[in-house]
A protein has these predicted regions:
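Short, charge/polar-rich alpha-helical segments
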Residues: 1-25, 57-60
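Surface positions of alpha-helical coiled-coils, especially the charged/polar e/g heptad sites
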Residues: 2, 6-9, 36, 43, ...
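Long amphipathic alpha-helical coiled-coil segments
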Residues: 2, 6-9, 61-86
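Charged/polar, solvent-exposed surface patches and flexible loops
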Residues: 8, 12, 19, 29, ...
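Amphipathic alpha-helical interaction segments
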Residues: 13-14, 39-42, 55, 66
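Extended alpha-helical coiled-coil "stalk/arm" regions
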Residues: 16-49
């Protein structure tokens, strides 16, 4: 792998994190509307649970992407060191 590959990978991963944060924000807004317009207490509770579950899912995905960014940064550093030795 080349240094350029890792740079592009980092850009892509950062864009994915931004998209995931935006998706989380939109989901939260959507579920807030569902909760507000729910007609029964049980449906409100169900929407609240779904909102929490979906937010947690987005959080896990964001954390996963952050770990991937860290791994890619480490790989980029190793590749730069290897390039210096050549």
């Amino acid at each position: 792998m080349t240094v350029e590959y890792y740079r592009k990978r980092l850009i892509d991963l950062r864009a994915q994190v931004a998209k995931e944060r935006e998706a989380k924000k939109k989901d939260n807004e959507r579920y807030a509307g569902y909760i507000k317009s729910a007609s029964t207490p049980s449906s409100k509770a169900s929407y609240r649970k779904q909102k929490i579950d979906h937010a947690a899912s987005h959080d896990r995905r964001i954390e996963s992407l952050k770990r991937e960014i860290e791994r890619t940064n480490d790989a980029l550093k190793r590749e730069r060191e290897r390039a210096k030795k050549r």
